[in-house]
Amino acid sequence: MRRTMFVVPAHLAPAVRSATVRDIHRQRAATTAQLGQALGWDERRCAEVETAVLAALTTHGAATAAQLAAEIPALREQMVTFPGKQYQSRQRVSSPILGLLAAEGRIRRTRPAGSWTSAQFRWAPARPLRAVPPAEAKTQLARRYLTAFGPATVADLKWWTGWSLTDTRGALAATGAQAVELDEGTGYLLPEGIEDIEDLGGRDGLQGAEGAGPAVALLPSLDPTPMGWRHRDWYLDPDHTKALFDRNGNIGPTIWWNGRIIGTWAQHPDGHLNHHLLTDPGGQARTAIEAETDRTRAFLADTRVTPCYRTPLERSLTT
């Protein structure tokens, strides 16, 4: 799924894995080729290191990447990623090896090594997941997606899952989703979603429904809501994209008002929350944003949070 980390309920993990198994096979081929080009490793060498990792985790129960590398010298070898690119860097072999084992469901990431904001995690052996037929898994995942993000277009679901166009259309059809007209074209909504709208009296009923008035939200970077659709114009001014996303398409912290993104926020090292509005939402919104900022600051208390993927605007608010 776009080689992005998703957190899902344990009972949904088998379907997620089966729905993306083709991509996992491609990831293994790509990782093996990358290690071969950078370090001269072949499939046999990769398998030996993977076996050593699994044996170490079985012995210890759980371990961080650094702990595994201290025990398995091969994991300390370094390779150049994206050679010749502006973002070229060096990384330990432990990163692609552990990532591949996790993608294949052979190990799982557990609790962080420190507080909940720590970027260092322990790894542990994973129990085998039950097999789900790929077509059934894709249908289940598409239904889950539409429940959370519908109505959505074919392009939205294809982008979110990383599936082919054929697989995306097939999964949508199997859900029984019904076509609805959206500003950006044809969208799809589950039958129960259409029934809910009809029960409220259609679009006019939605506008007047209890709790449907203007509301403010401060969402963290990479929150699944702004990353839920390929087409974003209905909740994000295209002119604001550059200020809110990094060059790889990762979104920073966002401020929402009345269902649209209107700015960003960041935590200063002293704990104070700064924000920047990209448009003037009016006095009511500014008052609500100040109140929500105070609430979020109180919630974070002494915790300091730094996004993994920084945007220039968010970074400027921390100085």
Language-model segment annotations:
Residues 1-226, 230-232, 237-319:
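Long, low-complexity intrinsically disordered regions
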